[in-house]
Each structure stands twice: as C-alpha cells, then as structure tokens.
Amino acid sequence: MPPPNTLSSLHRDLFDLGLRADMTVMVHSSLGRVGWTVGGPVTVIRALLGAIGTAGTLVMPTESPHVSDPSTWNDPRVPPEWYETIRENLPVFDPLTTPTTMGAIAEAFRTFPGTRRSNHPLVSVCANGRRAEEITKHHALEFCEGQGTPFEKLYDLDA
C-alpha cells in the first residue's frame, strides 16, 4: 500500500506534473483518485494553491445540476410523482450556499477563504487567486460554457 499523501508530497507531485508559480489552472479532481491524503481535500487545495503561488489562479468547476427541473435529472432519478413537490420547494441558486456535486475537493474549494464563485446556477466555477474576480465576474446564462463565460476567460488566459 502506498504511503498517504501529505502537503509536501503533493507539492512535489504537482511540480512533477508541471504546475508552476503564476499559472492559471482549471482542476477537475477526484479525492479517491488522488489517494488517501492527510488533511483530506483541504490539503489538496493548499497544495494546488501553493504550487501556483500568489500570482497564480486556481479554478474548479462547481456545477449544481440539482438546481433544475427534476424531470431532466438522470442522477439521481426521482419518481415523476415527486416532480411538483420538488419544483415548489427547490431552493434557488445562491453562489454562497448552494453546494456543488463535483466532489469533495471542489466542495471544499467552494468554501475556501478567498474563493469566488460565478453566478451561473447550473455550471458555475470557483476561482481563488490573482485573477479570481476577473474569471468569475460575469457568467452569461445563455451560453453557459462559451462566450461571455469564465470558460472563455480561461481560454483567453491559455489556462
């Protein structure tokens, strides 16, 4: 069995993967794939932020597909007889409180000090670092992953 990940071992691994200070990076993550980590998702986030430094920006998807019509849900499917109850009682999207379904690391990142979240109710992103405000400031509703979104900004930044 491999040893547990630590902040310093993750720093080395991220350096070996090519992360450097001043980078803007978007990270899709799985704590299970990272492996057992001392300190859990917070250690992974600290390692990522440490790798890119104060001049870098870390971005993660923080989608919340459950803030939608339940008849379109695939995971989890709910019985059709529940649709109306869910529609009438589903809380509205709030960037500060609506959880993400993108995993433990993304959920911890969403609430990490200094992290900002875009305002799209289904496909928001969170960012922390020098360009966080610039990346999350405007997120068009019509084209959720195209022009006028954080994804366009990431493309323009060669992230």
Go through the PLM ranges and name each one:
Residues 1-159:
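N-terminal and secondary-structure boundary signal
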